[in-house]
Amino acid sequence: AAYYAFININEYDRQLVEEHNAYWVNINKVPTLLFDHAEMVCKAHHLMRIQATTTPIAFHLLPEHFTLTQLQNLYEAINGEPIDKRNFRKRVAELGYVEKTKLIDKLTSRRGAALYKFNEEDYKKTLKFKL
């Protein structure tokens, strides 16, 4: 049996990782694994892609306020391929539960990027997700 989980990279037990000499690897650059573990990783990645495009789970991997670039980068990492910026932003706007805030991110953008947030209450009213 194999298990996978989406976790926020800022919210894991660092001590546990150090005790087991574990480390993060890029899903597209997984080193050689023993037994059927490579197959398990491929299956988990496939399931993660499905879950990330049919449920809003990815929003829990971002900070409370995020830029659309951060959201797009996350989906590109999960899917392993680039996404057209204009089409992605159009799809996000059509969701109806990703709200633009009045906050501006000046740390990762020279001009200052608008910050957004996921409105879980609005999502629960529709329970429809397709990104």
Give the location of each predicted region.
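Core RNA-modification/binding signature centered on pseudouridine synthases
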Residues: 53-131
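NUDIX/MutT-family hydrolases
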Residues: 2-9, 13-49, 64-69, 87-96, ...
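Broad gene-expression machinery/nucleic-acid interaction feature
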Residues: 1-2, 113
